[in-house]
Amino acid sequence: MKIVNSIKDLKAYLAEAKQDNKKIGFVPTMGALHNGHLSLVQHCVKNNDVCVVSVFVNPTQFNDKHDLETYPRTLEADCVLLESAGCDYVFAPSVEEMYPEPDTRTFDLGTVSEVMEGAKRPGHFNGVAQVVSKLFYIVEPDNAYFGEKDFQQIAVIRAMVKQLNIPVTINACPIVREGDGLALSSRNTRLTPEQRQKAPLIARTLKESTTFVPGKSVQEVIDYVVNTINSDPVMEVEYYEIVDGNTLESIKNWSDTDYPVGCITVYCGEVRLIDNIKY
């Protein structure tokens, strides 16, 4: 496995692979890797000849400076995990390498980038589109892999790829969970022991809520999820929306879509956790 810091070097390595008609798979990450990321890497290794993983904490997608500063950075440990998972190239550029000058591009990706996370974190998805488009131009992968925990992010990236005509297949991989149901996230390490004990309530409540469909209305299911989670004093639901899984538009009735997905964000103490479930 090679660890590469410069765009020029990575492009040189990958040019050889492309000349040999090798299929290139790519997993973009911000590091602080866990088994969720590693499952993406395993999908990538299995279905491609070359596996590239980027580790880059992208400043343009953080709308909270404190969040950027406290985001865990564990490159050495990440590389050990990536090597054992069969990764070929780790691309770990500096901010200066990725942004030699400010990226002033703004993306208009419609509803998928405006609702839920888009409304709560202004500029977040624009930053995601900036960095992922740059990474796609650098790596030129055949396949890219993203985790369904960030359900909305996948919709944003699909819209961006379509708009920019980037020839890459976006692969969405299932959420990986702890034994008690909590969706794996780099932010979980910031939970106190008490918060960590309480956090599985999110996944448990979402799962329970699927048993009410179609008997209860969409609004009744939303109320149940929000009230159940908020009944724990450590937890506060920021939003819970049931949307069409393709357009991300909120639905009022189950008949509005054949692909209803519930997307939730919960503050567990200071830590912001996200999850989703298909109905």
Swiss-Prot record:
Domain of life: Bacteria
Protein source organism: Parabacteroides distasonis (strain ATCC 8503 / DSM 20701 / CIP 104284 / JCM 5825 / NCTC 11152)
One GO CC term on file: cytosol
Keywords: ATP-binding, Cytoplasm, Ligase, Nucleotide-binding, Pantothenate biosynthesis
Top EC class, one word: ligase
Binding site for (R)-pantoate: 61, 153
The protein's annotated pathway: Cofactor biosynthesis; (R)-pantothenate biosynthesis; (R)-pantothenate from (R)-pantoate and beta-alanine: step 1/1
Main function: Catalyzes the condensation of pantoate with beta-alanine in an ATP-dependent reaction via a pantoyl-adenylate intermediate.
Quaternary structure note: Homodimer.
Official protein name in the record: Pantothenate synthetase
Molecular function terms, GO-annotated: ATP binding; pantoate-beta-alanine ligase activity
Annotated compartments: Cytoplasm
Name of one Pfam family that matches: Pantoate_ligase
Reaction it catalyzes: (R)-pantoate + beta-alanine + ATP = (R)-pantothenate + AMP + diphosphate + H(+)
Sites where the protein binds ATP: 30-37, 147-150, 176, 184-187
Family: Belongs to the pantothenate synthetase family.
UniProt EC number: 6.3.2.1
Note: The reaction proceeds by a bi uni uni bi ping pong mechanism.
Binding site for beta-alanine: 61
GO biological process: pantothenate biosynthetic process
Chief localization: cytoplasm
Active site: 37
